[in-house]
Amino acid sequence: MAVYVEDHPLIKHKLGLMRQKDISTKDFRDLASEVAGLLTYEATQDMETEVATIDGWAGPVQVERIKGKKITIVPILRAGLGMMDGVINLIPSAKVSVVGFYRDEKTLQPVQYYVKTASAMDERIALILDPMLATGGTLLATIELLKASGCTRIKGLFLVAAPEGIEKIQKAHPDVDIYVAAIDERLNEVGYILPGLGDAGDKIFGTK
């Protein structure tokens, strides 16, 4: 498993804006989408291309096109939806697979309440979207769900991550790559990332 911390100046700047306590819903939502797009650019650099000949304005011309497995983006409800547009803007043909989990208050384990995956998952590369990789429990459940559906190439895109969550995924699924704008210091006693972004879902949907 590789962990890619994207240290591009634009990502650093935009993430810094997102950390502001009094940021508006619109600004947080827009920035989440923009950073997701930048992460997508990095996460797709290893995609293979093939040469094709097309009719150009001055006659036949050779161009390169992406080949191989098709992409499905997998936003984790609900906050992952806030990153979806940034990815679709770059990969408009991507199919969308959606998963939803809630946390059992007694066991603190993720419980699946919704799943709808694209067809032919064994032929796709999955890009999981979630603003926060905290304890890693929800991501772990999502990866296992995708693998059970036949998907073998999985990547995760996150705005911020905690070392604890990354370590959990590295141990359980070393074949899954992680792309993140920043790795923060730690989790607090209730599982929030510090310094983090706060509740990303509330900030994206304006329910804070």
Swiss-Prot record:
Catalytic activity: UMP + diphosphate = 5-phospho-alpha-D-ribose 1-diphosphate + uracil
Enzyme category, top tier: transferase
Cofactor: Mg(2+)
InterPro entries reported for this sequence: PRibTrfase_dom, PRTase-like, Upp_B, UPRTase/APRTase, Ura_phspho_trans
E.C. no: 2.4.2.9
One of the GO BP terms on file: uracil salvage
Residues that hold uracil according to the record: I193, G198, D199, A200
Pathway involvement of the protein, from the record: Pyrimidine metabolism; UMP biosynthesis via salvage pathway; UMP from uracil: step 1/1
MF GO annotations: GTP binding; magnesium ion binding; uracil phosphoribosyltransferase activity
Top-rank taxon: Bacteria
UniProt entry keywords in alphabetical sequence: Allosteric enzyme, Glycosyltransferase, GTP-binding, Magnesium, Nucleotide-binding, Transferase
Cofactor binding note from Swiss-Prot or TrEMBL: Binds 1 Mg(2+) ion per subunit. The magnesium is bound as Mg-PRPP.
Positions annotated to bind 5-phospho-alpha-D-ribose 1-diphosphate: R78, R103, D130, P131, M132, L133, A134, T135, G136, G137, T138, D199
Regulation: Allosterically activated by GTP.
Function summary: Catalyzes the conversion of uracil and 5-phospho-alpha-D-ribose 1-diphosphate (PRPP) to UMP and diphosphate.
Entry similarity comment: Belongs to the UPRTase family.
Protein name: Uracil phosphoribosyltransferase
Source organism per UniProt: Desulforapulum autotrophicum (strain ATCC 43914 / DSM 3382 / VKM B-1955 / HRM2) (Desulfobacterium autotrophicum)
UniProt lineage: Bacteria, Pseudomonadati, Thermodesulfobacteriota, Desulfobacteria, Desulfobacterales
Gene: upp
